[in-house]
Regions:
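Ribosome-associated RNA-binding proteins
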Residues: 2-216
Length: 216
C-alpha cells in the first residue's frame, strides 16, 4: 500500500500530516460573488450573460478551465460561483480574474461606467466635434495640424461634451472594457511624435474614472 501511494502521490506521501491537510484543503478552490436584486445571471457552456436595468452583457470564458454556476445560498440569495479542481497559483489567479469580470458586468448593467478626459494644449487649442449620435469624435487643430482625426466609439458607448468643465469630454457605457478601449483610442490618436514628450505635453488624457451616479 505504501509503495502504491508513493508512486501515485509522491509529493503528498512524503509530506507530514499538516501538509497533507493543506493539500486536501486546496484540492478544491471556489470563489463566489453575490448577485443583487434586479439582475439576472445565466451561464451556458461558460458563456456568462448578465441582464439588468441598463441592458445586457455577454462574455465568453471558455478559455478558462473552470466550472461557473449560478446557485442560491441557504438564505435564498443568488450568487455566482467559480470552481477549480487541482488548481495551482496561476489558475487560482485566473479564477479570481473571471470573478472580477463578472463583478464588472454586474456593475455595468446596474450603474454603468463613466470616464472623463481632458484636453491638454499649450499653443494650439484642440477643437472637438461630437455629432448628435454621440458615437464618434472629430479632433481638429491638434498641434496646429490640418488633419482631422476621426475616432469611433466602441459598441454600447457614447461620448458627450461636459458643459460644466472646459475642455472635458465624458465617455459612458455598460462595458468597462469598451469604455476604456474608447478612451485608449482617443488617447492614441493624439500622440506626439518626433518631438520631446517632456516638453510637448499636448494630448487628451483620462482625468477621472468611476460609475454613473444616476442609476437608471
Amino acid at each position: 500500500m505504501k509503495l502504491f501511494l508513493a508512486l501515485v502521490f509522491p509529493s503528498v506521501f512524503r509530506c507530514e500530516t499538516r501538509s497533507i491537510y493543506v493539500h486536501a484543503h486546496t484540492y478544491e478552490y471556489t470563489v463566489h460573488t453575490q448577485v443583487p436584486e434586479g439582475v439576472t445571471v445565466s451561464v451556458e457552456h461558460r458563456v456568462v450573460t448578465v441582464k439588468g436595468p441598463r441592458g445586457e452583457l455577454v462574455r465568453d470564458f471558455k478559455h478558462v478551465r473552470a466550472e461557473i454556476e449560478v446557485v442560491k445560498d441557504s438564505e435564498g440569495k443568488t450568487k455566482v460561483t467559480c470552481q477549480l479542481w487541482h488548481a495551482k497559483s496561476k489558475q487560482r489567479s485566473a479564477l479570481r480574474t473571471v470573478l472580477s469580470h463578472i463583478d464588472n458586468m454586474i456593475t455595468g448593467v446596474t450603474k454603468g461606467f463613466r470616464y472623463k478626459m481632458r484636453f491638454v494644449y499649450a499653443h494650439f487649442p484642440v477643437n472637438a466635434n461630437i455629432p448628435k449620435e454621440a458615437d464618434r469624435i472629430e479632433i481638429r487643430n491638434f498641434l496646429g495640424e490640418k488633419r482631422v482625426r476621426h475616432v469611433p466609439m466602441q459598441p454600447g458607448c457614447k461620448i458627450i461634451r461636459d458643459n460644466t468643465v472646459k475642455d472635458q469630454i465624458i465617455i459612458e457605457g455598460n462595458s468597462i472594457e469598451n469604455v476604456s478601449r474608447s478612451c485608449a483610442e482617443i488617447r492614441g490618436s493624439c500622440l506626439v511624435r518626433k518631438k520631446d514628450i517632456r516638453k510637448f505635453l499636448d494630448g487628451i488624457y483620462v482625468s477621472e474614472k468611476g460609475v454613473i451616479e444616476t442609476e437608471m
